[in-house]
From Swiss-Prot:
One annotated GO biological process: proteolysis involved in protein catabolic process
Protein name, entry field: ATP-dependent Clp protease ATP-binding subunit ClpX
GO terms under cellular component: HslUV protease complex
Any one Gene Ontology molecular-function term assigned to this protein's record: ATP-dependent protein folding chaperone
Subunit structure: Component of the ClpX-ClpP complex. Forms a hexameric ring that, in the presence of ATP, binds to fourteen ClpP subunits assembled into a disk-like structure with a central cavity, resembling the structure of eukaryotic proteasomes.
SMART domains in UniProt: AAA, ClpB_D2-small, zf-C4_ClpX
């Protein structure tokens, strides 16, 4: 019986579709496999479709500035101008991130022009060409929107860190806080700037794509201002100007190699490539002495017999509102560093009324937090109005602002919280002005075994009225 002889056995063919090199335009051969131009085009289409889907999935749901502002109002008291500025800056930042994701996916999709198209590719070529044509006709198509990192100016305890935390919550992105004073130049003892990115990656549970949309708050940024004076050349400023130089690239946007564990000082570490263009950096600091620089500049501007000297009576927060890049440069920030923080917002010093509102009004106000803690033990915790105002007064005198409120309440309630779990008959604790000032202790209302529930509530009300009357 005769054998069928095939003369195509030695002819190179595509490993994927089986076509020979004579049936396709181009055949790319490898050591153990080959692929034709049609299969390559199909693979590119598949990858392009996945990129578009990934862009849609990874794009953040973007609340409008007014919605961000309303959310901040629920948790942050006062600072209206700062909240408005931050709402707009965050909206524009993540709008840019979403726009870049979409443009990147469309650019890859638009590059898939192949003459040997399959029927599926031919169907998809029309919208692809339409997008490409639309993009070529758009005069703004090649415009790149720069990052809008944020600089917060204001004294300690006015809510700079808390505002950044609230922004991360409303955007549902990873968030990390770092202290600029712990950062040093690469090669010196301390944390280098890549450590900040490593912490953000950990906050994102190792998800690089999610970390690339996170928020990093760098506190005490004023502490890395370059030193000035006669002795600047004696010792190297490893935690000042050098850190600013190291931060420039990641603030602007770069591909950084971030160690998954340990630090860059440990060799042979696994690293992740992180794109910092989508990371929002918020830098905050008290900038003590900056108001003097502004006042001096304004004084130089208005000289002569007809000069207006109203600037000498301006408050610090009013002076900070007039800060410009030259003032920050004279303070010690590099001009390049200032340029990468284009959005500047000033937070005003909090008043007694502001602190009183902070204690009671926000969704997670401190008073509500302690009331919830006491409620777990079945105890009703009450603060009189005079007590709340006394807490605010002490915080103002100490110069700690909102940051010091918790420590004052802790000190006031410490003995009560120590004894309370062992006292089964206490049903109400009343904190008055005297107990906040330390001249007395919080009032404990005990429940007698034979007292009906209705009479107990009356007794609680009477005791609270007596305390309020005594304070008045």
């Amino acid at each position: 019986m005769g054998r069928v002889v095939s003369y195509n056995e030695d002819v190179p063919r595509c490993t994927f579709c089986g076509k020979t090199e004579h049936q396709v335009r181009k055949l790319v051969a490898g050591p153990n496999a080959s692929i034709c131009d049609e299969c390559i085009a199909l693979c590119v289409d598949i990858i392009s479709e996945e990129r578009v889907k990934d862009a849609e999935v990874n794009s953040l749901s973007l609340p409008k500035p007014a919605q961000i502002f309303d959310y901040l109002n629920r948790y942050v008291i006062g600072q209206e101008n700062a909240k408005r500025a931050l709402s707009v800056a965050v909206y524009n930042h993540y709008k840019r991130v979403n726009m870049e994701l979409q443009e990147s996916a469309e650019q890859l999709d638009g590059n898939n022009g192949h003459s040997g198209q399959t029927s599926k590719q031919a169907k998809q070529s029309v919208p692809t060409q339409t997008r490409a044509t639309r993009r070529s006709n758009d005069p703004l198509a090649d415009v790149e929107v720069a990052k809008s990192n944020i600089l917060l100016l204001g004294p300690t305890g006015v809510g700079k860190t808390y505002l950044a935390q609230a922004l991360a919550r409303v955007m549902n992105v990873p968030f990390v806080i770092t202290d600029a004073t712990t950062l040093t130049e690469a090669g010196y003892v301390g944390d280098d700037v890549e450590t900040v990115l490593q912490r953000l990656l950990q906050a994102a549970d190792g998800d690089v794509s999610r970390a690339q949309h996170g928020i990093i708050y760098i506190d005490e940024i004023d502490k890395i201002a370059r030193k000035s004076g006669e002795n600047t050349s004696i010792t190297r400023d490893v935690s000042g100007e050098g850190v600013q130089q190291a931060l420039l690239k990641i603030l602007e946007g770069t591909i950084a190699s971030v160690p998954l564990e340990g630090t860059r000082k440990h060799k042979e570490q696994d690293v992740a490539q992180m794109d910092t263009r989508g990371i929002l950096f918020i830098c905050g600091g008290a900038f003590v002495g900056l108001t003097d620089i502004v006042r001096k500049r304004l004084g130089r501007r208005e000289t002569g017999f007809g000069a207006n000297w109203h600037d000498a009576d301006m408050k610090d927060e009013e002076l900070l509102e007039q800060v410009n890049a030259d003032d920050l440069a004279e303070f010690g920030l590099l001009p390049e560093f200032i340029g990468r923080l284009p959005v500047t917002s000033v937070l005003k010093e909090l008043t007694v009324d502001d602190l009183t509102a902070i204690l009671t009004q926000p969704a997670n106000a401190l008073i509500k937090q302690y009331r919830k803690l006491f409620a777990v033990d079945g105890v009703d915790l009450q603060f009189t109005e005079q007590a709340i105002r006394a807490i605010a007064d002490i915080a103002i005198k100490q110069g700690t602002g909102a940051r010091g409120l918790r420590s004052i309440i802790e000190r006031t309630l410490q003995d009560t919280m120590f004894q309370l779990p062992s006292l089964d008959d206490v049903r109400q604790v009343i904190v008055d002005k005297a107990s906040v000032e330390g001249s007395s202790t919080p009032k404990l209302l005990r429940e007698a075994v034979d007292v009906p529930q209705g009479r107990l509530k009356v007794a609680q009300s009477v005791l609270l009225d007596r305390v309020r009357t005594h304070e008045a």
